[in-house]
Amino acid sequence: MVLDREDVMKSPRLIAVLIVTIVLGVAGRANAQLKISDTETAKLYMSLATVGTAQALTQENVYNASGQKIAGLSPGMQTAFGDLGFLGKFGKHSEIEMYFDLYLASRNHPSQTYGDQGYLLIRGIPENLGQPRLLKAIFSKVDFKAGAFLVDFGDQESHRSNNAIVQQNPLVGNFVIDPNFVSVGVQLQSKPARYGWLVAATNGTNTEDFQSGRGNALNAKIYAYPIKPLRTSFSFYTVNHDETPAGTAGSRATLFSGNRSGERYGAVLGGGQAPGGVLPQAGKDVRAGQFDVTWDGASPIKLYGHIGQTMDKDTNGNAAGKPEESWRYYAADVVYRFTPAVYAAARYSAANALKLGNVDSNGKVDRIQFGGGLWLTKNMLMKVEYVTQKYRGFAEGDMVNNGIQAWRNPSFKGVVSEVSFAF
């Protein structure tokens, strides 16, 4: 059949069908960086990500520390976030990598650019150093990282949003307890393989810290692919800053008690740097472990889940007393791909308070998310999500995060949508 121009102009439905068919059949996630320089011994890449988010959320039973009820929320647009990253590969065989990235705009600093990661990764011996036998043997088995880098705890980083880097997250929001933390230190890791490991030592804070009594953090991970689509891992983290003052005046590890990369639900439950998220503990004497499992095979279904537990043995720091706080948390999500460009997703995540201020607790926070995404192009993703979250079971007087009274069973629910661009 041949259509002339008049036929086409009279058939907007046909045009719409053709456009949708092209989008659904061709679009899919891009895994590219822009190469901006390439020589025999140096390659430089740049990446850029930006995201705009709209929300229509409501909240109930939200009271601050003084007992005043916090007002409801209006629908609207969030601040647009942005990230800029640079990766350099040096040596004839790219033996050395240097990476740094900037938060151009973020929830913590919406109008200020500041650094996120910046590190050196050595994969082999540069040609200029010759081939020392011992070092060659070592770097044939391991890689070495040094600088400010994301502490490799758990596998959730492959399923969550990090400021404007959102396209690996099938939904809009993150997990209700969402461990993530950039710290300064060194890391030794095995070469990529079916089985692997890493160990790292950092200063246990997210910036330089030379306070007397500051501890040093250790973390480790082992992982395995028992069969090709299945990945399992176990992570461990420990640090002790309890010889420094309590609160922000002392050293603290914010793996759990802070979230610089932000949460996606603007102003809910008192707002802050991660609105809606549970930010447990003071980051003083912390021990944590997490088990992760991922299934990502040829089928249209992708599965991910984790379970973890974290405790702070002394939230007071060097003040009198040793109040303990501990939480258990878990999550599961499923993604179903209808085509390379269209998918649906659902996630359940929860946090159980085991002990608050040395008192056993039955408090629980549940978050349910479901939605989906459409790849408009290989670099643009549109997502929509419905979310509902509620606190329950906390004892009278229990407060969390920004002084929100958890015992009053605060909750929020509604719809969020975002459009992101990345290369």
Give the ranges of each region predicted by the language model.
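Bacterial N-terminal signal peptides that target proteins for export
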Residues: D7-A16
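Outer membrane beta-barrel
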Residues: L34-T58, A71-T207, S212-H241, Y330-A341, ...
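Bacterial N-terminal signal peptides
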Residues: A16-G25
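Sec/Tat signal peptide C-region and signal peptidase I cleavage site
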Residues: V26-A32
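Short, Lys/Arg-enriched N-terminal segments with co-localized hydrophobic residues
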Residues: M1-V8, N31
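Short, glycine/charged-enriched secondary-structure capping and boundary segments
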Residues: V62-Y63, H159-N162, D398-M399
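Outer-membrane beta-barrel pore domains
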Residues: Q59, K69-A71, Y119-I122, T232-N240, ...
